[in-house]
Regions:
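Conserved phosphate- and dinucleotide-binding cores of soluble alpha/beta proteins
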Residues: 1-49, 113-148
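N-terminal active-site beta-alpha-beta segment that forms phosphate/nucleotide-binding
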Residues: 50-132
Length: 148
């Protein structure tokens, strides 16, 4: 526990009136799939290959992702919404789209990296930035995306 006033007021994220107690749960899983991956939390980077992102298994989703991958533009700030768009990064990696020249983001606040899909949608390995989703929507509403 910290003494009252031990944190600079601008760094406080949750006012004390809303806190009854603090519990540390050391076994809390990071994702639905359990365990803890330092490359998802941004604490570690590791080399990854073009098969680092799994392809969507459903053929119709893969077809849609392939078509959408053709619309990606190098240097454009691109938002991937939830659902079908989650399959686009995996297809783009394998189909010769210059993945490293793209600026990718999702509403959860992740920028770039190896975007994950399915139960891990909203996560990325080796992200360049992970910001609060409220800040992400400010970025979007302020004109920060070129393609969505």
């Amino acid at each position: 526990m910290l003494e009252a006033g031990a944190i600079e007021p601008r760094r406080v994220k949750l006012p004390g009136i809303l806190v009854d107690g603090i519990v540390e749960h050391r076994e809390q899983p990071q994702t639905y799939l359990g365990g803890y991956d330092l490359t998802i939390s941004g604490q570690h980077r590791r080399l990854s290959s073009n098969d680092a992102i799994e392809l969507v298994s459903h053929p119709v989703r893969r077809l849609i992702a392939r078509r959408a991958a053709r619309e990606l533009v190098a240097g454009a700030s691109t938002n991937f919404g939830f659902g079908i768009p989650g399959g686009i990064p995996g297809v783009a990696l394998r189909e010769g789209v210059p993945y490293q020249s793209l600026w990718l983001s999702v509403e959860q606040g992740v920028h770039n990296g190896m975007m994950l899909d399915d139960a891990l949608f909203g996560c990325a390995r080796n992200a360049d930035a992970i910001i609060p989703s409220l800040d992400q929507f400010e970025f979007y509403s302020g004109g920060g995306i070129d393609i969505t």
